[in-house]
Curated annotation (Swiss-Prot):
Residue intervals passing through the bilayer: none
InterPro entries assigned: Immunoreceptor_sig_adapters, SH2, SH2_dom_sf
Protein name: B-cell linker protein
Record's compositionally biased regions (Pro residues): 236-245
Subunit and interaction comment: Associates with PLCG1, VAV1 and NCK1 in a B-cell antigen receptor-dependent fashion. Interacts with VAV3, PLCG2 and GRB2. Interacts through its SH2 domain with CD79A. Interacts (via SH2 domain) with SYK; phosphorylated and activated by SYK. Interacts (via SH2 domain) with SCIMP; this interaction is dependent on phosphorylation of SCIMP 'Tyr-131'.
Entry keyword Thylakoid: no
Associated disease: Agammaglobulinemia 4, autosomal recessive: A primary immunodeficiency characterized by profoundly low or absent serum antibodies and low or absent circulating B-cells due to an early block of B-cell development. Affected individuals develop severe infections in the first years of life.
Main localization (coarse): cytoplasm
SMART domains hit by this protein: SH2
GO biological process, alphabetically ordered: B cell differentiation; B cell receptor signaling pathway; cell surface receptor protein tyrosine kinase signaling pathway; humoral immune response; inflammatory response; intracellular signal transduction; positive regulation of gene expression
Length: 456
């Protein structure tokens, strides 16, 4: 029984504890549900209470109904009318009345006195009426001043015109127009015109004298000594007269006489060649250049003509037959010199394939070789390297690359070596082995170039 009591007592206590827990849970659940219900009821009106506190709670419930839009229209209209009506009435009277008054005072036209350069204090009393009446004469006042300036200018020109008449001695009357702007330069030009006035007078005299004197070349020392003296003076100061003698006068060998006699002989020599240019020498210096100019082209043509026949005749024999032969030989020698092949013991020249192979078979040594010209005479493949190895003869083409002016062995391939001359190819493969490919048997061999063979 004691055991049963011990077992039943805790069981009853546990039941009581469970009942309390259930009771507490129910109470708690009831409180939570009430709180949730309260939140659901109070949540919507909480917002309008803060924004619209003046309205009653009954109105707040109505605001969330279908008439919600109508409730917001009324406060907006009242607020707009109250906000914009008051400042418009008060500010309109204060802000917009003074500006028109200031604008009326501004058109007093204060700019007119400033345009004249006068001060406002001097014309303070005459602000309104006089400026309008005086602006009209101010406009014609400007042309009046210009007219005065123009009137002064002709007066100056009239004063300067008497200075001009001594100047036209130089036969230039148009310079009077240019004298007005620059006064100092005119005075500078007066002196040279007076000193230079005698030569223009002599110039027409020389032109007139040349015509009758052309028929009488012996008259200058006797009859018209004055006129001819002027002509000699014009020729003597410029030493350019003897300059054409070495150019056109290469044939005659008599320029070593005295100066007056040489000048006479020069004139006579020119007259003997062409009588017309003799008069031109006396008339103007520009015509002398025109006379000398045709003398030069034949001299230049002779220079070009001389080297052309020289190589043809020096060769001797028939020029037509012997001419082209040295041209081919010269071209071949130039190409051979560039390739570094000329006068080499391993160079066979224009040797055909059969004779080259026979010479190598006769040597019967591995590594024997020679260089011959290709049988096709192709500029891209000018030479052929012939090598003997293992009782076989290999003909390897030597290509010439025109773009870089270099040489290469065999067909074009990637990673091939380029050389500046054929001699460099031979020197390279005398130290490093050369790969020999047999296209028939698909075999590869290598050997160095050891023995140079000559074709007998």
């Amino acid at each position: 029984m004691d055991k049963l009591n011990k077992i039943t007592v805790p069981a009853s206590q546990k039941l009581r504890q469970l009942q309390k827990m259930v009771h507490d849970i129910k109470n708690n659940e009831g409180g939570i549900m009430n709180k949730i219900k309260k939140l659901k009821v109070k949540a919507p009106p909480s917002v309008p209470r803060r924004d619209y506190a003046s309205e009653s709670p009954a109105d707040e419930e109505e605001q969330w109904s279908d008439d919600f839009d109508s409730d917001y229209e009324n406060p907006d209209e009242h607020s707009d009318s109250e906000m914009y009506v008051m400042p418009a009435e008060e500010n309109a009277d204060d802000s917009y009345e003074p500006p028109p008054v200031e604008q009326e005072t501004r058109p007093v036209h204060p700019a007119l006195p400033f345009a004249r350069g006068e001060y406002i204090d001097n014309r303070s009393s005459q602000r309104h009426s006089p400026p309008f009446s005086k602006t009209l004469p101010s406009k014609p006042s400007w042309p009046s001043e210009k007219a005065r300036l123009t009137s002064t200018l002709p007066a100056l020109t009239a004063l300067q015109k008497p200075q001009v008449p001594p100047k036209p001695k130089g036969l230039l009357e148009d310079e009077a127009d240019y004298v007005v702007p620059v006064e100092d330069n005119d005075e500078n030009y007066i002196h040279p015109t007076e000193s230079s006035s005698p030569p223009p007078e002599k110039a027409p005299m020389v032109n007139r004298s040349t015509k009758p004197n052309s028929s009488t070349p012996a008259s200058p020392p006797g009859t018209a000594s004055g006129r001819n003296s002027g002509a000699w003076e014009t020729k003597s100061p410029p030493p350019a007269a003897p300059s054409p003698l070495p150019r056109a006068g290469k044939k005659p060998t008599t320029p070593l006489k005295t100066t007056p006699v040489a000048s006479q002989q020069n004139a006579s020599s020119v007259c003997e060649e062409k009588p017309i240019p003799a008069e031109r020498h006396r008339g103007s210096s520009h015509r002398q250049e025109a006379v000398q100019s045709p003398v030069f082209p034949p001299a230049q043509k002779q220079i070009h003509q001389k080297p052309i026949p020289l190589p043809r005749f020096t060769e001797g024999g028939n020029p037509t037959v012997d001419g082209p032969l040295p041209s081919f030989s010269s071209n071949s020698t130039i190409s051979e010199q560039e390739a570094g092949v000329l006068c080499k013991p391993w160079y066979a020249g224009a040797c055909d394939r059969k004779s080259a192979e026979e010479a190598l078979h006769r040597s019967n040594k591995d590594g024997s070789f020679l260089i011959r010209k290709s049988s096709g005479h192709d500029s891209k493949q000018p030479y052929t390297l012939v090598v003997f190895f293992n009782k076989r003869v290999y003909n390897i083409p030597v290509r010439f690359i025109e773009a870089t002016k270099q040489y290469a062995l065999g067909r074009k391939k990637n990673g091939e070596e380029y050389f500046g001359s054929v001699a460099e190819i031979i020197r390279n493969h005398q130290h490093s082995p050369l790969v020999l490919i047999d296209s028939q048997n698909n075999t590869k061999d290598s050997t160095r170039l050891k023995y140079a063979v000559k074709v007998s």
